Amino acid sequence: MGDLPGSTGGGGGVGGGGNGGGGPTIAGTNGNSTTGPGSSTGSTGLERPPSPARLSHTSEKHPKVTLSELNMLRRHRELCDVVLNVGGRKIFAHRVILSACSSYFCAMFTGELEESRQTEVTIRDIDENAMELLIDFCYTAHIIVEESNVQTLLPAACLLQLVEIQDICCEFLKRQLDPTNCLGIRAFADTHSCRELLRIADKFTQHNFQEVMESEEFLLLPVGQLVDIICSDELNVRSEEQVFNAVMSWLKYNVAERRQHLPQVLQHVRLPLLSPKFLVGTVGSDLLVRSDEACRDLVDEAKNYLLLPQERPLMQGPRTRPRKPTRRGEVLFAVGGWCSGDAIASVERFDPQTNDWKMVAPMSKRRCGVGVAVLNDLLYAVGGHDGQSYLNSIERYDPQTNQWSCDVAPTTSCRTSVGVAVLDGFLYAVGGQDGVQCLNHVERYDPKENKWSKVAPMTTRRLGVAVAVLGGFLYAIGGSDGQCPLNTVERYDPRHNKWVAVSPMSTRRKHLGCAVFNNYIYAVGGRDDCMELSSAERYNPLTNTWSPIVAMTSRRSGVGLAVVNGQLYAVGGFDGSAYLKTIEVYDPETNQWRLCGCMNYRRLGGGVGVMRAPQTENYMWCENSFKQQATSN
């Protein structure tokens, strides 16, 4: 037998020291025998202690196997030393397991409480099904939280001080938030001291107040909770008139019991911020307001504020302070696309403040696979396919006049399924296809010169590519090289006129949606080799990594993605069987998508762009214009 690695094999061969000893020299002892008086002491004359052989091992299976065996013992009622009586149901368990998992049980079984000496313990004020689920979790580390059990699980987890389950229940409820239930979730969170859930439910309620005020939950609010909501500076409303109307709807739901609360509630409506016409004609003439002296005083205060502008500096207070909702004043345009078997020219505008879609002037050409971007407060529609031909023409929309112009220079190549974005005052057209081949060409438009010029091509041909601008770079994301969908990503540096690869997405995607939101690049939907996708992920440029987020509610290929007033909207697309006109919005705090209405038209491969709301009403079309446009499409 030879020496083990690290030994020198000196002296007497295998045993070392020339004595035919009983084993090999161990690695790390420098080949010197440590037995007998003849052991080497080294150059210092001091005996060097041996380095013992070691193999460290931590079992990954052990915790799972142990828990599984303990759970089997429980189910067979073996070695159980306590029975929990919950609502007449008896649950067998082991004190040590319960104490290790729950501070509540630890205090019960290790202290001087009477229960520490009992073999059967009655637990009150807890649902027996919830208790059984929680005991199962203690033994299996697994639990399913769903709509049917969360309202009993969360109180039970709070009582037993199972913090992990509390957090899971709160996370589940965050994902369920919508305008019809957020007030109930808010109250539930408040009752059970779930501060983070309460904060998020509050924020959701404030941001979506215009929809929340229409819900039945709003009409059923206790007066204290109503006041908590309407006194917030963060209430997202178009005008204070909405707050007054919401309060009066709540009051008139049960006038007999609630009219006594009108002065308390009305003092939190910022009457001085109302228009004079509404203050006098609606508030001042309301019989319930006029019949209460305190309410009349509030109306008089508001009148004085409006009539005496020179005195306003002396009249400042909570009721004169404007509310501060998150970013406002942006609208979303959905442009062209494919609908009912043909390309379309129709364009519509979405205002999140009214949650309403309205038709605006159509383009002069039908365009599917069109690239859309906003430059200098004008909306550009680049290329596309009109149902017969690939296009290089461009149209430009002015929201102030509600008109499209065709005086923009065409691109050097015809392009459909093209990515379009704005960087440093230039409009970039990236990739696409020209009817002959998939393109890696990139060109940019100078609005001052009305001229396109080519820049460095991408390293990969890409049609159905998504583009985004972040940190001074232009990103080209996914698409197809003409053969298969791509997950690769590259970015363009205009200072060096060069494309460089960055980390790929986790999923191959063509015809995906892409937008920059909170310093991340979001990529959603699209199509892989097999099917349309609902999955979504986001890119962090600081770490050069992609991470998944929750999937959309629908599969969407050819989807538009845009950020409007601080919210991320996914618009239209194709789910594999139908063209979509539905819209969904993503909340990064809850990591949740929710449906929020529909366009007038179904759109696959349409473009989206975001602009400041126009200052005039010229962009609003009458019903007859809508019908004419529908006929033209």
Swiss-Prot record:
Pathway: Protein modification; protein ubiquitination. Keywords: Actin-binding, Kelch repeat, Repeat, Ubl conjugation pathway. GO terms for molecular function: actin binding. Residues 182-284 form the BACK domain. Residues 80-147 form the BTB domain. GO terms for biological process: negative regulation of synaptic assembly at neuromuscular junction; protein ubiquitination. The keyword Transcription does not apply. Coiled coil: none annotated. Pfam families: BACK, BTB, Kelch_1. Residues 26-45 have a biased composition (Low complexity). It comes from the Eukaryota. Residues 7-25 have a biased composition (Gly residues). SMART domains: BACK, BTB, Kelch. SUPFAM superfamilies: Galactose oxidase, central domain, Kelch motif, POZ domain. The keyword Repeat applies. InterPro entries: BACK, BTB-kelch_protein, BTB/POZ_dom, Gal_Oxase/kelch_b-propeller, Kelch-typ_b-propeller, Kelch_1, SKP1/BTB/POZ_sf. Residues 1-62 are annotated as: Disordered. Kelch repeats lie at residues 331-377, 379-425, 426-472, 474-519, 521-566, 567-613. Probable substrate-specific adapter of an E3 ubiquitin-protein ligase complex which mediates the ubiquitination and subsequent proteasomal degradation of target proteins. May have a role in synapse differentiation and growth. PANTHER family: KELCH PROTEIN, KELCH-LIKE PROTEIN 20. This is Kelch-like protein diablo. It comes from Drosophila ananassae. The gene is dbo.
